[in-house]
Amino acid sequence: MEAAEGSENYDGIQVLLSREVIDTAPQCPHGPTLLFVKVSQGKEQGRRFYACSACRDRKDCHFFQWEDEKVSQARLAAREEYNKSHQPPMTHAEYARSFQEFTALPLAKRKFCCDCQQLLLQTNWETHSRHRVLGDISLSQLKRPSQLLHPLENKKANAQYLFADRSCTFLLDTIIALGFRRVLCVGTPRLHELIKLRACKGTTPPIKSLLLDIDFRYSQFYSEEEFSHYNMFNHHFFGGEAAKLVCQKFLQEEDGNGALLVTDPPFGGLVEPLAFSFKRLREMWKDSNPENANNLPIFWMFPYFFESRILQCFPDFAMLDYQVDYDNHALYKHGKTGRKQSPVRIFTDLPLDKIVLPASEGYRFCSVCERFVCSENKHCDICNRCTSKDGRSWKHCSQCKKCVKPSWSHCSACNHCALPGHPCGTAGDGCFLCGGKGHKRRGCPHLSVSADGERMKRNLKQRSIKGNMKKQPTATTSKKKKRKRNNPC
């Protein structure tokens, strides 16, 4: 068994990744599950278990199975039936035929159900008569499905934050300037839309794009050559081998030349499974020319504080200063300053000096670092580089021998820089509660002696309060219990 390539041993839950594990893993509605294990002091603790690759909360996907658990044939059959029942109601080919019928309708008969997020043919009107329905859907609206569809906003599953037009335009202009002519859009529907819109207008060199996304709703708007239902956390094509071949053919056109992978994963997702999937996509690209020493170039959008994790998986990557903005995120928007700026950056293996950041948005070229940086990112002569990560001017600490955030100061007790007023001695690899080594807070003996007694008292008190309320069970709660019993996972 191999751990994620480049992953470090750390306390907590760790994912174990290999091609063999994913190919033989049990499946949930989101494809092959991932194998996890609890790790303490770099060593496995307890039994390994399978859980959903896409959802971090068991409320969103109930799947759980011990690695060594014996599963009956009846349970396997029930699980397979359950997985099938949670797939899209139509195949991609059926959606494509429906879309052709829809576009042939006159404007007055083109309707979209806002509640079901579905394009409606006349045969569906009666079924959706009590729903919120949008009429007169124009052809231009059909070319911008990300503006028609409600973004998925579950932060622990498939949260969709869509590029603002400013960032999307910058990305496409940069892609064109770098000479790429085919873009594999993994979780970037806005970029896919813009590429297709510009291709229709003929205002830019011809660029092709293929969208891979876990949101099957895009099947309503794009053909099988334009979109594949895909889970980037386990490299699973829901359309099977046919969809995988479409992607492989797209990557291998012109012997793989001129192709670029652009991805914008959910920020709460594990870095290691994502990197594993991107490496699998690189392998698909390389099959066209196995002797090619190069790799499929990547633009990976992710918060800057994941830099170390990404560099563990891709040591040849570097982070751009460009701040990626989103339309439907309260904080990640252009124009904010200081710590409220968007923390999302672009990680890439392309030469940084070739990527020009717009001066109109406050970026400048550092001749020493040979790359474009944020205007507030001052060059440190001691570190010999522009050191800021968050858009503010950082300061050099001679004792730490590195630049730190402007709000930090050196703590002689901790022997490193931190926020003023921080609790000394709680940082590090030991226990947060007592500061001891060899265990974490959950396994602290002091917690079991003192805190557990108080917690038990609180629980008993809460139970007595609930008992006194004499609340009658509602229909909704009984339904929830029934659903839980019927779940085969």
Curated annotation (Swiss-Prot):
Binding site for Zn(2+) 2: 113, 116, 128, 131
One Pfam family cited in the UniProt record for this chain: Zn_ribbon_GRF
EC number: 2.1.1.-
Amino acids binding Zn(2+) 4: 380, 383, 396, 403
Any GO molecular function: rRNA (adenine-N6-)-methyltransferase activity
Gene Ontology CC entries for this record: cytoplasm; nucleolus
Binding site for Zn(2+) 5: 397, 400, 410, 417
Localisation per UniProt entry: Cytoplasm; Nucleus, Nucleolus
Regions that span the bilayer: none
Protein keywords: Cytoplasm, Metal-binding, Methyltransferase, Nucleus, S-adenosyl-L-methionine, Transferase, Zinc, Zinc-finger
Positions bound to S-adenosyl-L-methionine: 160-163, 190, 213, 231-232, 264
Residues that coordinate or bind Zn(2+) 1: 28, 30, 52, 61
Group of enzyme by EC: transferase
Start and end residues of each DHHC domain: 381-431
Residue stretches of biased makeup (Basic residues): 478-489
Example GO biological process: positive regulation of translation
Span of zinc fingers (CCHC-type): 429-446
Sequence similarity: Belongs to the ZCCHC4 family.
Function according to Swiss-Prot or TrEMBL: rRNA N6-methyltransferase that specifically methylates the adenine in position 4220 of 28S rRNA. N6-methylation of adenine(4220) in 28S rRNA is required for translation.
Domain notes for this protein: The regulatory loop blocks the catalytic center by bridging the methyltransferase domain and the C-terminal CCHC-type zinc finger, resulting in an autoinhibitory conformation.
UniProt name for this protein: rRNA N(6)-adenosine-methyltransferase ZCCHC4
Organism: Xenopus laevis (African clawed frog)
Name of the gene encoding the protein in the UniProt record: zcchc4
